């Protein structure tokens, strides 16, 4: 191996583990957290933009008010209770019926500089207390945290029972409806929004309901709190600059998600050597690794993070064990070859058992075990302790034996096109979240691709790295060639299922279907036209998603395709620190409206536009609008062609009109004019 390639591989390994992108706060400096003890037994957590006041009457703690210091708006809470518990017998109590065990404590938060969750690397201030309700045999540890440079206060509640507490519902945020507070999305786990403020239970199954007087955020609790099983849940109260709700909320999410935004460029075997119920083998997998190694990693110096092997590696009659004919040594050889070129191995697993005949066989095997693996209407159930521990053991062994860098978890709980778990799959999703936390504790840098069974709640990102956009894996929509219709379908369902249903969900954290150039499924019928493939590649990388899926048979690509793939993926990598801000621009692809993605940072911006129709169309690019610029930010930009990398200025100014030919994809780098 040549020296420069060896150095390049070392660079890849370092970058894979430690690259972190962070979004800029779109307002004035937030500043260090402060905690003040005020006369009258009150405590205030604050910084330059946010302020929250708690009152201690010697028996308990209540919320007095929450303030946006920049907008000069204070929500007076009237000494509101910290929480409300509903029990199985329909009785209701609030935190006012708990008593302080000891005087509350104020303290500094010690930063963990090695944490993968960005907020954990920061210091701050904490106000905490312990409560008890002797009659119920319940204790609570509560804390309110404000980290340095945060635009939000988090409250963490940990309930512990002396024996068993049959709590059925926990209400943690209760706001007066007359202030105009609304639910900020159509799915469970959406935050509540009041002007430029946001409030939420940090859980994908959190729900919002309205009464005559209040809008409340609550979580159903279907599993009793017991002496050996505590319940921890958290809330957030935050604020954003006026006109910057999406970006201000994103700033919070990027700090608190399990891992900040990162790009995971990888080959996926589905549509290629994996398909339906067929099995593949080590030689086929090694061929794909070596082809990508030679054509992309070495020849074109592209960082390929992983090779993920989808359904087809296992023996259906063993449940998540290798088929010995295809993989007599498991993934040992694959891992060795992948790691030698600076990459890694990923693997597909389906919590509920997969699909079609393979699923039937796996479930039949599970039923015949002693004791049998638990199931629900959709397949295996992680809520069952027998199956949970089997699934956990399998995933732990993949990490231990093959240093797996990513899991694709395909199929859990309610399945595809869900907007929440419902009562039927609530326990299954709780178990799934626990599984993700268990795995992240074993390997904090692990990438977890959460697919079928998720919905557009940002709080999935507290546990994994992305969700599925919902809809079909692939389809056709709109006009043009079959591949152009495939692009329109992919992006159209992102628009309908995420942009519209979960407007505060980060578009950077989606599995949207990737690039498919392979042998099986609907994409096999797509003509491999170089122009269409280029449009597919650039529109995909222009979407800014961190999960960069290449469902590609490398033998199908010609030199033009390889060069395009290399240029587009490297362009995305060069803009990794901008991509977290990616947001929607334009209209509905399926209605043949011009659309695209944009992302902004104080240093530079990017813009991708596509015309999904067979007619020439014009689009007005107003920099302030497409980049959603904060107030008092310059909006005079120079636009350059990202595809060619040319230094020729294509457009300049605050606004310009662009003409897009039928099915044209344009990608711009934008720099402030000097």
Residue positions per predicted region:
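Acidic-aromatic substrate-binding/catalytic surfaces of carbohydrate-active enzymes
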Residues: 40-130
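Active-site-proximal substrate-binding groove within the catalytic cores of carbohydrate-active enzymes
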Residues: 47-48, 66, 228-230, 268, ...
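Active-site-adjacent "subsite" loops/lids of carbohydrate-active enzymes
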Residues: 271, 275-277, 344-402
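Active-site groove signature of glycoside hydrolases
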Residues: 302-313, 392-422
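Conserved structural scaffold segments of CAZyme catalytic domains across common CAZy folds
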Residues: 105-346, 350-360, 547-590, 599-605, ...
């Amino acid at each position: 191996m040549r020296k420069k390639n060896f150095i390049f591989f070392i660079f890849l390994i370092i970058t894979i583990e430690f690259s972190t992108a962070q979004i800029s706060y779109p307002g004035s400096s937030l500043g260090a957290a402060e905690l003040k003890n005020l006369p009258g037994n009150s405590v205030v957590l604050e910084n330059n933009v946010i302020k929250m006041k708690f009152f201690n009457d010697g028996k308990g703690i209540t919320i007095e008010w929450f303030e946006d210091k920049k907008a000069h708006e204070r929500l007076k809470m009237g000494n509101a209770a910290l929480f409300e518990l509903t029990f199985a017998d329909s009785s209701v109590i609030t935190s006012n019926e708990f008593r302080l065990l000891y005087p509350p404590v104020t303290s500094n938060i010690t930063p963990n500089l090695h944490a993968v969750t960005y907020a954990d690397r920061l210091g701050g201030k904490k106000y905490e207390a312990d409560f008890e309700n002797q009659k119920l045999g319940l204790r609570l540890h509560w804390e309110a945290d404000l980290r340095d440079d945060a635009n939000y206060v988090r409250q963490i509640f940990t309930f512990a029972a002396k024996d068993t507490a049959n709590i059925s519902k926990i209400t943690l945020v209760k706001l007066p409806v007359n202030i105009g507070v609304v639910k900020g999305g159509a799915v469970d786990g959406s935050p509540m929004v009041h002007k430029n403020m946001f409030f939420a239970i940090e859980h994908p199954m959190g729900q919002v309901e309205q009464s005559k007087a209040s809008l409340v955020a609550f979580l159903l609790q279907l599993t009793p709190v017991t002496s050996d099983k505590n319940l921890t849940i958290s809330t957030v109260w935050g604020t954003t600059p006026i006109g910057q709700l999406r970006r201000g909320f994103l700033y919070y999410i990027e700090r608190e998600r399990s891992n900040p935004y990162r790009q995971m460029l990888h080959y996926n075997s589905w549509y290629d050597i994996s398909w339906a119920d067929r099995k593949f083998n080590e030689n086929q997998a090694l061929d794909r690794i070596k082809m990508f190694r030679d054509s992309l990693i070495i020849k074109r110096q592209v960082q390929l993070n992983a090779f993920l092997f989808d359904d087809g590696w296992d023996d259906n009659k063993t449940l998540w064990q290798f088929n010995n004919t295809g993989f007599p040594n498991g993934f040992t050889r694959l891992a060795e070859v992948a790691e030698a070129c600076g990459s890694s191995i990923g693997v597909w697993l389906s919590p509920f058992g997969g699909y079609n005949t393979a699923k039937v066989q796996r479930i039949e095997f599970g039923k015949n075990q002693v004791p049998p693996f638990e199931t629900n209407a959709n397949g295996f159930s992680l809520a069952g302790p027998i199956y949970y521990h089997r699934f956990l053991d399998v995933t732990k062994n993949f990490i231990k034996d093959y240093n797996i860098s990513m899991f694709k978890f395909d199929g859990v709980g309610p399945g595809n096109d869900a907007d929440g778990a419902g009562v039927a799959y609530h326990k299954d999703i709780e178990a799934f979240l626990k599984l993700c936390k268990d795995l992240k504790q074993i390997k904090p840098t692990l990438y977890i691709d959460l697919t079928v069974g998720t919905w557009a709640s940002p709080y999935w990102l507290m546990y994994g790295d992305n969700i599925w956009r919902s809809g079909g894996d692939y389809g056709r929509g709109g006009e043009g060639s079959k591949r152009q219709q495939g692009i329109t379908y992919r992006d159209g369902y992102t628009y309908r299922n995420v942009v519209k249903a979960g407007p505060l969900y980060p578009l950077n954290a989606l599995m949207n279907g990737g690039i498919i150039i392979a042998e099986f499924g609907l994409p096999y019928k797509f003509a491999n036209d170089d122009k269409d493939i280029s449009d597919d590649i650039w529109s995909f990388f222009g979407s800014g998603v961190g999960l960069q899926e290449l469902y590609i048979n490398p033998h199908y690509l010609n030199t033009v395709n390889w060069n395009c793939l290399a240029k587009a993926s490297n362009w995305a990598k060069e803009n990794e620190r901008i991509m977290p801000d990616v947001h929607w621009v334009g209209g509905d692809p399926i209605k043949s409206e011009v659309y695209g993605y944009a992302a902004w940072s104080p240093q530079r911006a990017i813009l991708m536009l596509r015309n999904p129709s067979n007619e020439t169309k014009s689009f007005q690019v107003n920099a302030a609008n497409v980049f959603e610029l904060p107030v008092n930010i310059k909006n005079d930009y120079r636009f350059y062609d990202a595809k060619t990398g040319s230094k020729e200025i294509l457009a300049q100014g605050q606004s310009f009109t662009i003409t897009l030919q039928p099915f044209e994809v344009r990608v711009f780098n934008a720099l402030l004019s000097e």
